[in-house]
């Protein structure tokens, strides 16, 4: 592998995304070097792949939002919510939840849109988003929101 194509993340911004942690936790990717690299370096960008992914992901996001509005008309929905960084076993965890639904009783449901194949790691990833939301509330001394559920929406609708 040619590591010269990778750019070092800025000092203080070394972090892992929930998808990387989820793949390691589900043993979909159990390579320790991969975790180490993901924390410290950005992989080279493949613009063609990224453009195709953005189109598919946007379609699934729209489908997810329509489903949430249909099933939970009284819920407040935050789409593509950037979550604050939290500490997970000495690593910074940063991510963006595709949708967080807040119900009138204060409970939350965390949702993620997926444009690829179904994987066990997707459930772990959406669970980590819930952990992050609760962790930020704890660190601020605020009341910790109750997570009442998780949802995944796949592009094969």
Residue ranges and their predicted role:
Residues 107-108, 157:
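Hydrophobic residues embedded in beta-strands of well-ordered beta-sheets
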Residues 134-157:
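Substrate-binding beta-hairpin/strand module that engages nucleic acids
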Residues 1-107, 117-119, 123-124, 134:
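Metal-dependent nuclease catalytic cores that hydrolyze phosphodiester bonds in DNA/RNA
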Residues 111:
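Conserved beta3 VAIK motif of the Hanks protein kinase fold
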